[in-house]
Amino acid sequence: MLILISPAKTLDYQSPLTTTRYTLPELLDNSQQLIHEARKLTPPQISTLMRISDKLAGINAARFHDWQPDFTPENARQAILAFKGDVYTGLQAETFSEDDFDFAQQHLRMLSGLYGVLRPLDLMQPYRLEMGIRLENTRGKDLYQFWGDIITNKLNEALAAQGDNVVINLASDEYFKSVKPKKLNAEIIKPVFLDEKNGKFKIISFYAKKARGLMSRFIIENRLTKPEQLTGFNSEGYFFDEASSSNGELVFKRYEQR
């Protein structure tokens, strides 16, 4: 199984690292082309394009400027330990064992606007470039056109390497849109997390994002290899609802805490 998750806007380059092992991103030539385009933007243009404050725009203009093609543990850190958002709160990679990192390196991929596809131990320099941003480039009007089939091809390589044909889609719609399902040599399973609110079950963004991380951790910790094993997921009160599920969609629900 290959698990797909989204990156996070919040980054952590200060906390102690729980592993010293690292690999290098496999699509850096593409990243370098995007950096070339991003460096043309002024902070006000970045602010408008990304819908962020002037302060954040200044920080990200500096990140684009400081980005270097040579990645070292001094100027970068492992992606799975650098991202800090709701998904990564659930994942808690900072508590992984070396064996957990090994399994994750084979079975987990992070989709990225700048790096395309990241393995957990791939070094990553800080950036902010969401997949849905309309950054004009040499290949088109946005990042979806820039990446084209590249991300899908890289995922197919990972699937072939593990002799598998199942993708667990725990990424957001914005990021999964960078994947071409018809060209992906895999069955796609999408876990959906519903929380009860005033007697009704619905997707609540914060909880759903954290649950994607919890599910990723559940797969990694238990070394799961078959999609039917996912139905045993019960972290933080979630349970599998077979009646609401279908072949491609596994529905998990959680009752409101009273």
UniProtKB/Swiss-Prot annotation:
Entry GO terms, CC: cytosol
Xref: InterPro entries: YaaA
GO biological process, one term: response to hydroperoxide
Superkingdom classification of source: Bacteria
Record-stated family: Belongs to the UPF0246 family.
PANTHER family on file: PEROXIDE STRESS RESISTANCE PROTEIN YAAA (PTHR30283:SF4), PEROXIDE STRESS RESPONSE PROTEIN YAAA (PTHR30283)
HAMAP family recorded: UPF0246
Name of the molecule in the record: UPF0246 protein YaaA
